[in-house]
Amino acid sequence: MTIFSSIDILQWSELSDLNQKQLKELLLSADPDWQHVLSYLPDVSLFIMFNQQQDVIAELCLLQCNHDEFEIKNLSVRQDHQGLGLAKLLISHVIEYVKKSLGSKVWVKTGNSSLNQLALYQKCGFRMSHIQRDVFKSYPEPIYEQGIRCIDQVVLSIQLDEMDASS
């Protein structure tokens, strides 16, 4: 059974109104601060996964930080499609894209309370780099996941040349 029909790389402005609405819901599920999301949307490449009806079912926002480093700014899978390996597939797709773009490192930042996300990234080869304290204290509404208040930001990275050497 095919769950998705394609992964496309698009810009926000290239999306239809319906796809923008579907994507906005996904973006907000990963980062509830819409103003923050809007601050990076113009600068990212959107990797969007569509189902066969052309509905947005998953997204990943990738920012090129400099000539060889990239950051995953946002990753979300529609709730009714979670647990099917789509996030892992998107991450793998993006890692291959970064390699083809001659990138050497991918960063991702997530909350200290995002236990599922921390597990996912580590399963994909990311390693913890450092913690930025109190990043989420300034959010308008406190964020709780699995009963844990999200306060600190955990920074993970994957060094692609090391990944190739170990395979």
Regions found by a protein language model. Give the residues of each.
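Acetyl-CoA-dependent GNAT
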Residues: I3-D80, I91-S92
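Short hydrophobic/aromatic beta-strand or adjacent loop that forms the aromatic wall/cage
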Residues: V44-L46, C150-V155
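Conserved beta-strand segments that form the floor/walls of ligand-binding pockets within enzyme
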Residues: E71, S76, W107-K109, V155
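Conserved acetyl-CoA-binding loop-helix of GNAT-fold acetyltransferases
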Residues: V77, G83-E96, K123
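Conserved GNAT acetyl-CoA-binding A-motif
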Residues: V98-G111
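Conserved beta-strand-loop-alpha-helix junction that forms the acyl-donor binding cleft
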Residues: V108-L118, S129, R133-Y139
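Short proline/glycine-enriched turn/loop segments at secondary-structure junctions
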Residues: E141-R149
